Amino acid sequence: LLQRLCATDVAVPPGTVRYAPMLDRHGGIACDLTVARLSPTDYYLVSGTAMATHDIDHIARHIRPTESVSVVDITSGYGVLGLMGPQSRTLLQRLAESDLGRDVFPFGTMQDVMIAGAPVRVLRISLVGELGYELHVPTEYLLTVFDALHDVGIEHDLMNAGYRAIDSL
């Protein structure tokens, strides 16, 4: 289903992350997604802000009767923190229980990592043209991870920037 709907190849090895827009019948962008392959049969889809319902509906409308597909909306269970910039790996590594080095965690991949004692799905992607990560954190751990990032980030000149700040770049 996703291979048919996405404008990029998502038949990739588990752990791979792809920017994967879905097109409408006129060739315009219907959905703007990031797709991470978790296993041979499972994917993790990330919609743009406030677009989950729209994107799930688009996917559901294209499931063929012969396709056995389940789509589960887990939006309310996670918060996303973007950590971008040349010091992002150094900062994140101080809190992670796994090696985040370039050779073991290259661009366009994802790992499930313990960060500040919390289970975090980390996507090694960036929307700002710099080294960066998206941290997908269960909501019950979000404040813990945010505070830990800021505690370590003081020495790296970490600053908060709202999601819309990306549009100014």
Task: List the model feature ranges, each with a label.
Residues 1-169:
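Basic, glycine/lysine-rich polyanion-binding surfaces/domains
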